[in-house]
């Protein structure tokens, strides 16, 4: 009998460990947020099962605020959100006219799907799919106009996996928006200052001093002329 190989979900859990003690008590909480004229009702399912995927983090709110203040145009754009957690960023992109795929590890999909159903009208362009960076990203097309991520840069072993996933998903003239709490102890600054600029044209789009959140915009480097 042939060896079936490693189980993708088990492999992803070894790279993205659950922080069991983070939300030890299990409970759900609904919160409302207003962006771009939309009132979003987001359920956060706190508990050890979801860990960091349970809550709406500051970086996600900063990114939504940025999209509103900069009037970022999602209409007709093919969009994917990575490490979505609650799905708030991707949901806003869908409500703004994007054709959106919202992704995270399998354990977070039920929460995301519930939030999509609560906020995106029937017929809206928002689908929810599992994506484990560096493991199954190649089953997704390589033609996304916009790749979004909020507070997904905090585990150094995942940095090469995230980088490869970004390189695959973003089309040649597409744009990546990454919002991140700048945690020195998690290697976040190193990722944005050293690793990502090796492969993408990177610029700091906005800095939120109060929340210590940076929003970066990245694009593929133009090929050098022969």
Curated annotation (Swiss-Prot):
One GO molecular-function entry: heat shock protein binding
Predominant location category: cytoplasm
Disulfide bonds: none
The enzyme's E.C. designation: 2.1.1.-
SUPFAM superfamilies per record: S-adenosyl-L-methionine-dependent methyltransferases
Gene3D superfamilies on file: Vaccinia Virus protein VP39
Top-tier EC class: transferase
Subunit text: Interacts with members of the heat shock protein 70 and 90 families and of the TCP-1 chaperonin family, as well as with HSPD1, STIP1 and tubulin; at least some of these proteins may be methylation substrates.
Identification of the protein by name: EEF1A lysine methyltransferase 3
Natural source organism: Homo sapiens (Human)
Organism taxonomic ancestry: Eukaryota, Metazoa, Chordata, Craniata, Vertebrata
